[in-house]
């Protein structure tokens, strides 16, 4: 895959602009939500594959895609479908679906994934958690794709069943048995993080992520990185997926530099760091 030459500056946007940009892509550029989700999810699958290939062997990898209730979860459903085929088909892929989707678009993406043969683990009960643990133990290397919350999450208490999900992921990451072989790949925003991370303080040590939050090994930003990506610790892999920006939108949001990253790129993602 071709990748853009490394650029020194990566623009970011706050949560309110991320929401408006999504609306503009639909209302001004006439994308459908299904088109955005399909392209974003495919980009997530490609970037995840690249990350796995750079850190392990695909044939030895197990991938668990954790899908939330909103568009981020829909992106995860698309990503899981693509990760289960093509160059990733030798890996073992599962989807953890803590709760059935309520939106019509996510229901359609779920139906497509089921017809494609994607294997699901549903609910957050003891049986589901046991199935997840068995899956992890069967994998030589384990990758968790965090597609739970996107830029609409503004921090604060997490409601059931996703509080159980986040606590489970935190336990995985810190477990003596599972942690060393676990890598977390977050989609757009690490779940549980405030999109703008304002409460962390702009002048604090950015390596000090508050306790009780996920520490992703890789982040796949979509369209334009969000402000919270500035708090990624050194060494975190950072990808950009979804080449949706038009020149006019790039100017309107003052993120023209993003378009330079896509110059000469044929894949649906680029490596930022």
Curated annotation (Swiss-Prot):
SUPFAM superfamilies documented for this protein: YjeF N-terminal domain-like (SSF64153)
Annotated GO MF terms: metal ion binding; NAD(P)HX epimerase activity; nucleotide binding
Entry binding sites for K(+): 72, 146, 191
UniProt-annotated binding residues for (6S)-NADPHX: 71-75, 150-157, 162, 188
UniProt xrefs under Pfam families: YjeF_N (PF03853)
Residue ranges occupied by any YjeF N-terminal domain in the UniProt entry: 18-257
Cofactor entry: K(+)
EC number: 5.1.99.6
UniProt keyword annotations, A-Z: Isomerase, Metal-binding, NAD, NADP, Nucleotide-binding, Potassium
Reactions the enzyme catalyzes: (6R)-NADHX = (6S)-NADHX; (6R)-NADPHX = (6S)-NADPHX
Family indicated by similarity: Belongs to the NnrE/AIBP family.
Role of this protein: Catalyzes the epimerization of the S- and R-forms of NAD(P)HX, a damaged form of NAD(P)H that is a result of enzymatic or heat-dependent hydration. This is a prerequisite for the S-specific NAD(P)H-hydrate dehydratase to allow the repair of both epimers of NAD(P)HX.
PANTHER family for the chain: NAD(P)H-HYDRATE EPIMERASE
Name of the molecule in the record: NAD(P)H-hydrate epimerase
